[in-house]
Amino acid sequence: MLIGKYFKKIKPDFRSHYFSGICFNSKLCEKNHIFFAIKGNEINGNNYIKHAISKGAKTIVYNKKFQGFKNGILYLSFNNVRKILAETSYKIFFPKIKNLIAVTGTNGKSSICNFYYQILNLNKKKVASLGTLGLKTVFGNLQMLNTT
């Protein structure tokens, strides 16, 4: 993943920097991860930056002044590291749905939804259907109450 896709307010020079995951516990850092050094009430994540780097972190998000590359590590400075972690996590793990089809009307909604589901599924698209008949995915069907 390229860091520029997830961090909009950084210098253009940093946008093509690669990362493979995120962590805020230095023990869980792996190669090419971003380490978020969060300052808490009792523990300061800045004290674990060296450990995160030794585990493979290539990017450090912290609240100190320096921003840039140092010894092959990219340091990004933000006032609220906890907020940046939340925003980045959301962008990585909950990307926006690219396409959403809604069917409204008096009659035939379930049939139309089923037709769309079949057409999209046959065309190798990621698809799910939620309606009166429940939740339908490639993994199976699930009966649901109160879908309308």
What are these regions (language model features)?
Residues 1-87:
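N-terminal leader/targeting and accessory segments in enzymes
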